[in-house]
């Protein structure tokens, strides 16, 4: 199987190996440490706006997790891609799929948080029409 984005499942449904892989991805990409329970209990419903990037060995190399935050808004809970897959269009593919899915279900807004020092992510979101609405001092 080639590298591709696949529909994701709720973290509650993932096996321990997948949880460990996701924890390592979060650590590598954000510096944040999560417990198995904190990953498993993230509010991620099963819908076609949630994706995982699987490599040719069926290993998780990225994820875009979003939840239906309100009747009009989708909130990005996590968006992380392994460094070996960054800058190759994988993030854009996932983003476009999630946006199309959200619009198709009537959502009008997307909300997310990003670290102020994550220039790569900020540029990624700005290139897709996102703008900074508020800065949360001391959040990270």
Predicted regions and their residues:
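Short acidic N-proximal helix/loop "leader" segments that mark the beginning
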Residues: 1-3
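Acetyl-CoA-dependent GNAT
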Residues: 5-84, 95-97, 101, 105
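Positions that flank functional sites
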Residues: 41, 117, 140
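A cross-domain feature marking catalytic cores of carbohydrate-active enzymes
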Residues: 68, 114-116
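Flexible, glycine-rich phosphate/dinucleotide-binding loops
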Residues: 73, 119, 139
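Conserved glycine-rich acetyl-CoA-binding loop
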Residues: 82-96, 105, 109, 116-123, ...
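Conserved catalytic-core motifs of GNAT/GCN5-like acyltransferases
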Residues: 113-114, 126, 131-140
């Amino acid at each position: 199987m080639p590298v591709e984005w696949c529909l994701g499942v709720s973290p509650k449904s993932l096996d321990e190996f997948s949880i460990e892989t996701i924890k390592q991805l979060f650590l590598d990409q954000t510096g944040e440490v999560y417990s198995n329970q904190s990953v498993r209990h993230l509010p991620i419903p099963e819908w076609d706006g949630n994706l995982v990037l699987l490599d040719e060995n069926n290993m998780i190399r990225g994820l875009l997790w979003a939840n239906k935050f309100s009747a009009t808004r989708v909130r990005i809970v996590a968006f992380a891609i392994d460094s070996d897959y960054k800058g190759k269009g994988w993030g854009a593919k996932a983003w476009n799929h999630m946006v199309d899915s959200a619009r198709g279900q009537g959502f009008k807004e997307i909300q997310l948080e990003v670290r102020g020092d994550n220039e790569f992510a900020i540029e990624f979101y700005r290139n897709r029409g996102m703008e900074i609405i508020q800065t949360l001092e001391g959040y990270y």
